[in-house]
């Protein structure tokens, strides 16, 4: 089962993903893509860590997501990735278009092949106005294209608003 959970900042998407992982009854590997570039992000990361059960395996991978998924995925394991848009940001800031393209394609290729349960969390960025800056516009565009491609490969897609899951594809939660 592959789940994509979308939502805005502080929408409850991570809590929902963590709940689904815990309820799966499987061993959980939590793949964190965030990097603590400043104090505020460091506090967010600490908040997420504090919420996770101690027995969950945590891996921090800001760039090579597909390789990490391939190495961790197995029947009887749940992989929770939080989050795709931070991973995308990390790749955009690498300023290496070939790396971005390669990592994105590797992720899309491996999703259909992975055994076990996969839960992907991402920020929906396309509901606001078109950003003024070139990099910001590219980020919103890349996130939108990535979400479409991943949603196509997932059995269930859920949009989270105010802590409430709204089904977009597949069985409602």
Curated annotation (Swiss-Prot):
Q: Matching SUPFAM superfamilies, A to Z?
A: P-loop containing nucleoside triphosphate hydrolases
Q: Where does GTP bind?
A: 7-14, 32-34, 49-52, 60, 82
Task: Give the E.C. number(s).
Answer: 2.7.1.156, 2.7.7.62
GO terms in the biological process aspect are: cobalamin biosynthetic process
- Give the record's family classification: Belongs to the CobU/CobP family.
The pathway noted for it is:
Cofactor biosynthesis; adenosylcobalamin biosynthesis; adenosylcobalamin from cob(II)yrinate a,c-diamide: step 5/7; Cofactor biosynthesis; adenosylcobalamin biosynthesis; adenosylcobalamin from cob(II)yrinate a,c-diamide: step 6/7
Keyword annotations for this protein, in alphabetical order, are:
ATP-binding, Cobalamin biosynthesis, GTP-binding, Kinase, Nucleotide-binding, Transferase
Q: Which GO terms describe its molecular function?
A: adenosylcobinamide kinase activity; ATP binding; cobinamide phosphate guanylyltransferase activity; GTP binding
Whom does it interact with, and what assembly results?
Homodimer.
Protein name, per record: Bifunctional adenosylcobalamin biosynthesis protein CobP
């Amino acid at each position: 089962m592959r789940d994509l959970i979308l939502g805005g900042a502080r929408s409850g998407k991570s809590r929902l993903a963590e709940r689904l992982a815990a309820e799966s009854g499987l061993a959980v590997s939590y793949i964190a893509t965030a990097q603590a570039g400043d104090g505020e992000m460091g506090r967010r990361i600490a908040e997420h860590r504090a919420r996770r059960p101690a027995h969950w395996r945590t891996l921090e991978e800001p760039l090579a997501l597909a390789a990490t998924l391939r190495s961790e995925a197995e029947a009887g394991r749940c992989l929770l990735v939080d989050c795709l848009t931070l991973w995308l940001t990390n790749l955009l800031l690498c300023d290496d278009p070939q790396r971005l393209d390669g990592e994105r394609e590797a992720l899309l290729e491996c999703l259909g092949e992975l055994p076990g349960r996969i839960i992907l969390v991402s920020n929906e960025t396309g509901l606001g106005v078109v950003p003024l800056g070139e990099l910001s516009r590219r980020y919103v565009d890349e996130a939108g294209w990535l979400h479409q491609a991943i949603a196509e490969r997932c059995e269930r897609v859920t949009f989270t608003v105010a802590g409430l899951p709204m089904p977009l594809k597949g069985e409602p939660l």
